[in-house]
Amino acid sequence: MKVKFLGSFFEEFPPPDYPEVVFVGRSNVGKSSLLNMVVGSKVAKVSKTPGRTRAVNYFLLDKKLYLVDVPGYGYAKVGREEMEKWRKMMERYFKERKDNIKMAFLLIDAVAGVQPLDEQMIEWFEYYGIPFTVVITKIDKASQSEIAKTLKQVKRYVGDGAIVLSSAKEGKGKKELLSRILN
């Protein structure tokens, strides 16, 4: 698998020459880590500090697909003005690219569970007709009861087939995610 970083975009996005797979979720849910795990190399910058990803980052996979790492929503160590700027950028991204998005991976932390902003994101995907899969992340850090609780929450919104359990640290879920990306 060959992955090339195309750049960080704030205003204009790359031409919609390839279908897009976008990684979406709350700040610090593991979007960049998951992207790195899926492609097998550290192409996306990772940080323990919420809000590290501040632009829409595009990666070209095998010259046939864009992988898109977007800023997280919710808590981040930035001011309200910066958060509002991100919100507008994300809204513009989804409105402009909705027809180009092949799949959105909505990442939900196994310990934190479904939060109100996650519910809003699901509603947004449904409104815009964007296909999505919920990826329950950081299962290596969660107890079985926390995972079960989060699974139960997620199943209220999506069927069993639209859920992947993952751990970027342990490589869990990679096969299922690659299958959804490449097919």
Swiss-Prot record:
User: What keywords tag this UniProt record?
Assistant: Cell cycle, Cell division, GTP-binding, Magnesium, Metal-binding, Nucleotide-binding, Septation
HAMAP family of this UniProt entry? GTPase_EngB (MF_00321)
Report the cofactors. Mg(2+)
Q: Which CDD domains match?
A: YihA_EngB (cd01876)
Q: Which gene encodes it?
A: engB
Give the GO cellular component terms, alphabetically. cytosol
Annotated residues that bind Mg(2+) are located at 32, 53
Q: Which residues of the sequence carry a binding annotation for GTP? A: 25-32, 51-55, 69-72, 137-140, 166-168
GO biological-process terms attached to the record:
division septum assembly
> Which InterPro entries does the UniProt entry name for this protein?
G_ENGB_dom, GTP-bd, GTP-bd_ribosome_bio_YsxC, P-loop_NTPase, Small_GTP-bd
The answer to whether keyword Metal-binding applies is yes
Which is an annotated GO molecular function term of this record? GTP binding
What name does UniProt use for this protein? Probable GTP-binding protein EngB
Concerning its family, UniProt says: Belongs to the TRAFAC class TrmE-Era-EngA-EngB-Septin-like GTPase superfamily. EngB GTPase family.
Quote the Pfam families the UniProt record gives.
MMR_HSR1
- Please report the stretch or stretches of sequence annotated as the EngB-type G domain: 17-183
Q: Which domain of life is it from?
A: Bacteria
Q: What Gene3D superfamilies would the database entry show?
A: P-loop containing nucleotide triphosphate hydrolases
- Function according to Swiss-Prot or TrEMBL: Necessary for normal cell division and for the maintenance of normal septation.
Q: Does the keyword Heme apply?
A: no
